[in-house]
């Protein structure tokens, strides 16, 4: 079940104010954020946002196709290291 339309999309207030300030200046800086639950809005297109993945900040360049998605979708939190090489031998 999605979010109610009358509420609107969730965006962190601090992140939104930083984006608006940069849009007024016309400046393109990397913005650090821990808010993975924030929805990407059309005002964010063209900016690079460093999203925290639990260990470090992953730079995410926002394009038009990303609008409506969450920031956390583009910063994976887990790394797949592969299965064990001798996995077939241990099954026998």
Curated annotation (Swiss-Prot):
Q: Name one GO molecular function term.
A: structural constituent of ribosome
Membrane-crossing ranges are: none
Keyword check for Glycoprotein: no
The record's section on Pfam families has: Ribosomal_S19
One GO term (biological process):
ribosomal small subunit assembly
Q: Known InterPro entries for this protein?
A: Ribosomal_uS19, Ribosomal_uS19_bac-type, Ribosomal_uS19_CS, Ribosomal_uS19_SF
Which UniProt key words apply to this protein? Answer: Ribonucleoprotein, Ribosomal protein, RNA-binding, rRNA-binding
Q: Which NCBIfam families match?
A: rpsS_bact
Q: What does this protein do?
A: Protein S19 forms a complex with S13 that binds strongly to the 16S ribosomal RNA.
Which family does the UniProt entry place this protein in? Belongs to the universal ribosomal protein uS19 family.
Q: What is this protein called?
A: Small ribosomal subunit protein uS19
Species whose genome carries this gene = Rippkaea orientalis (strain PCC 8801 / RF-1) (Cyanothece sp. (strain PCC 8801))
Q: Which gene encodes it?
A: rpsS
